[in-house]
Amino acid sequence: MEVHNVELQISAVRPDQYPEQGYPEIALVGRSNVGKSSLTNTLINRKSYARTSSQPGKTQTLNFYRVEDQLFFVDVPGYGYAKVSQKEREKWGKMIEKYITSRKELKGVISLVDARHEPTDDDITMYQYLRYYDIPVLVVATKSDKIARGKWNQHESKIKKALDFDGSSAFQMFSAQTKMGKEEVWKWIEDRMGE
């Protein structure tokens, strides 16, 4: 998709704040600092449109980015950040659960994991949760440029094994630095938009 127009339409905490256009929505989930903002910026050809942060746990709302008046990217609060209080985490958890389980415009979820490491317990829980609700998932392994190309298959296998990867899900190695995987991620998104 050629992207020229992107706008942060709303940062929502409740369903009554969600956009009403009815465009397809693709949510981005992952632990804090896994690279959600970098993926978003790469997909929309911007250097720093989605706020990248060296402070994990920064995103505390569902941020709806309107792309070309055709779809929304929904940046979901990062999970697994220790300095956020238990009460805050529970509040986010309920907000995310409500969105994922009841939003009819949600066409798929991009679940980000760090390609360099095995998925965390939170990554595994999120993936299994999405599969339980039968939501189409693309697992994107970020920071792939930090791994020697000859070891990609080994890392992919470890990630899939840890997640108990389901054949109905998709998987993509990705690098915001080199843009590797960008076209494949867009293809998956466009396929979901048609559903």
Swiss-Prot record:
InterPro entries: G_ENGB_dom, GTP-bd, GTP-bd_ribosome_bio_YsxC, P-loop_NTPase, Small_GTP-bd
Domain of life: Bacteria
Residues in EngB-type G domain copies: 22-195
Binding site for GTP: 30-37, 57-61, 75-78, 142-145, 173-176
UniProt cross-references to SUPFAM superfamilies, sorted A to Z: P-loop containing nucleoside triphosphate hydrolases
Assigned GO CC terms: cytosol
Similarity field: Belongs to the TRAFAC class TrmE-Era-EngA-EngB-Septin-like GTPase superfamily. EngB GTPase family.
Keyword Cell cycle attributed: yes
Record keywords: Cell cycle, Cell division, GTP-binding, Magnesium, Metal-binding, Nucleotide-binding, Septation
Residues annotated as binding Mg(2+): 37, 59
Source organism of the structure: Pediococcus pentosaceus (strain ATCC 25745 / CCUG 21536 / LMG 10740 / 183-1w)
Primary role: Necessary for normal cell division and for the maintenance of normal septation.
Protein name: Probable GTP-binding protein EngB
CDD domains, alphabetized: YihA_EngB
Cofactor: Mg(2+)
Any one of the GO BP annotations: division septum assembly
GO molecular function annotations of the record: GTP binding; metal ion binding
